[in-house]
């Protein structure tokens, strides 16, 4: 009788077993994720507090507007980080599946928003360096704020519903009291192709901008030699280099790994979570630019 019950439990997927609700992350991975996200939260909160001074700078500057949008992206992401820390610590998700989708999707939205803003800032500064663009600020503050709001109005209504609609649609991904297990959706050919295209695009753009930055710095060093450090433009390019380095250390590794992860989501899921958590370290950018005053970050 006992043997028949055991066999029935194994063969009938409707019978709840401990294996159905077993955590998908081992303790070393959970500890790593808790440490990373805790550090991200502390650094992010500190950076946001310090970057408030940015509001006192020239709000019409294109670069300042880009930084303000970067702050908003970090802020929205940081709101969801405590939920991740709690889940990895308790291994239990007690909130709704919809909230799970929001928290899980936000880290991806953060990655793409931060990359987009980085790319815009670097492109603007490259164009300014090569004197391809003279207009660097709006004529009125209201126009600047309107342009900033337009970016979010256009992106969020498209990006958020698309991501939330795709997350967790597969029944195989749904686990009671568990979250962040949406790997099955990648088996959809369209989702797989979209992820591959996005990863390759981000890697390619990052490499191109790294190359351009290296060329600019090399040209300035050859032109001014040891006097380079006395040139204001040189320090602007150094700040650009920091953006590039953050992209190369936080965003590119995740997307390089993702090219492999997309072909083996089950086995590589824990490692993918760690690489995804590392993207949150982009919040460090706010601390980087608050040394001698935020005003020095932006050229006008």
Could you tell me what each predicted segment is?
Residues 1-49:
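Extracellular N-terminal segment of 7TM GPCRs
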Residues 16-34, 97-106, 177-194, 231-234, ...:
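Juxtamembrane membrane-interface segments at transmembrane-helix boundaries in membrane proteins
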Residues 29-34, 63-65, 69, 73-121:
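Extracellular TM2-ECL1-early TM3 structural module of rhodopsin-like
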Residues 111-146:
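Class A GPCR helix-loop hinge within the 7TM core
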Residues 140, 158-201:
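Loop architecture of class A 7-transmembrane GPCRs
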Residues 215-256:
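Intracellular effector-coupling site of seven-transmembrane GPCRs
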Residues 243, 249-256, 270-300:
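Seventh transmembrane helix
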């Amino acid at each position: 009788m006992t043997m028949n019950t055991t066999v029935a439990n194994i063969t009938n997927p409707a019978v709840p077993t401990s294996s159905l609700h077993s955590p998908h992350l081992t303790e070393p991975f959970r500890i790593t994720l808790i440490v990373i996200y805790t550090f991200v939260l502390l650094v992010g909160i500190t950076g946001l507090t310090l970057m408030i001074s940015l509001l006192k700078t020239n709000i019409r500057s294109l670069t300042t507007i880009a930084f303000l949008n970067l702050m908003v992206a970090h802020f929205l992401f940081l709101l969801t980080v405590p939920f991740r820390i709690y889940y990895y610590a308790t291994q239990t998700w007690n909130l709704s599946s919809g909230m799970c989708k929001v928290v899980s999707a936000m880290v991806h939205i953060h990655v793409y928003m931060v990359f987009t803003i980085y790319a815009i800032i670097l492109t603007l500064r490259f164009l300014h360096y090569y004197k391809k663009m003279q207009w660097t600020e709006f004529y009125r503050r209201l126009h600047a704020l309107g342009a900033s709001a337009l970016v979010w109005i256009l992106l969020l209504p498209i990006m958020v519903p698309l991501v939330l609609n795709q997350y967790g649609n597969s029944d195989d991904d749904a686990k009671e009291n568990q979250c962040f297990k949406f790997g099955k959706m990648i088996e959809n050919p369209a989702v797989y192709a979209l992820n591959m295209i996005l990863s390759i695009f981000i890697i390619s753009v990052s490499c191109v901008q790294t190359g351009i930055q290296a060329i600019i710095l090399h040209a300035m060093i050859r032109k001014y030699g040891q006097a380079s450090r006395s040139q204001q433009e040189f320090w602007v390019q150094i700040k650009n280099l920091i953006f590039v380095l953050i992209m190369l250390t936080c965003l590119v590794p995740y997307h390089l790994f993702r090219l492999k992860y997309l072909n083996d989501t089950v086995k590589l899921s824990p490692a993918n979570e760690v690489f995804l958590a590392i993207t949150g370290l982009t919040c460090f950018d706010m601390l980087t630019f608050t040394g001698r005053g935020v005003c020095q970050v932006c050229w006008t």
